[in-house]
Every structure is written in structure tokens, then in C-alpha cells.
């Protein structure tokens, strides 16, 4: 496993991907995403044990602006990827794309840019093969056009799924599969963080990924983030 971690470090050194920064305060009192914030035990996105590993890195020095925040600041999304083999007894590692929104650090397991998921079985030369396959694919991903991301998010923002709280909660439970308690928590969190009611696919994906941030176990968090990505897939061209 740690050979794979070393391979990821090699990839990070050769590409633009890194451990994400985090939100800090500014002199004006506004929350600001700082890509150069020092890595701490609380902010790291590398998790591992003797048997499993989960790593999430982003290209947060090349943001994609998807609109404006209520305070007039740009609303930024960053390309990223994760590698995981945390399923019990897993005999392979996989790498797939993910996106992170700067203002809230929500993560979306979304394959809108057609990045082919890479799977590497644990064999003697797994780390070398992983680096050889993943490095060029991630470099291409990082340097690609932002059109599909922007079009996908715009489509999600335009796709209305609810007119009131009752309809939104019903959608989160019936369509997404959240429990009544989780649906209520997601709806409330979205209102608190976005300062508007949940009405669109984009709103729902942000609500889901917001409550996912509270989940300490990465596998369980990723399950919710995949649900958000699947929602976005329903409207992305």
C-alpha cells in the first residue's frame, strides 16, 4: 500500500495536484479559500492504515469559476482525483476524478469530463504501473477544457426539482435515497450555507455533499459524494 502512496507522491510532484488548502478568515472578515494553507492533521486528505488507503488531491491553483458568491467573490471549483482501496480485502487500487468547491470544500464524485477510471491490481510492479498510467491521464485531465464542467453545472442549476420544503425532502428521500433524518439535515444545511431554499439539482448536490463533510469514515463519505455525482450526471450532456 505504501508503495502506492509513494507513487501518488511522484504523480503529485510531476503534476499540479496537491493536498487542498482550506478556508481561512481575511481582514475584512470574509471566508477565503487559501490554497497555500499549511497541511495539518485536521486538513490532510491522506488517510491510511496497515490495510487501506484513501487519498484525495486537487489542482486548486487552477480554479474553475462557476459564478459569483453572494458577497461578489468568485465561486470556484477545483479538479481533483481520489485513490482508494479501502474496501475490506481489496486486491486493487482505483483512481477516479472528483471536484471540490472552494467556498465550502464540498466534494463531488463526478465523471463529467469522461476520465476513465483506472484500476491497478496489487502485484509486484503495481506502483510503477500506477504511475505510468495515471500520470499522463491526470495531466491531460488537469489541462483540459472547462466547457463540460461549466455546462454540467449550469444544467444542474437550471434543473428545478422542488418548489417548497416538502417537495425537496421528498426528492432527497425518494430520488436520492436519504433517510428522513438525513434529508432534513441536508435541507437545513443547504439553507444555512447557501442562504436560499433547495430547489434545483445543483442545490441538492450541494446539500448532500455538505452533510457528507461530517462523516469521518471516507468510504461512507464517498458513498454520499457519489450520490451527488450521480444526480449531476442526470442533467449533464
Task: Name each model feature, range by range.
Residues 2, 7, 12-236:
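Intrinsic disorder/low-complexity polar-acidic segments
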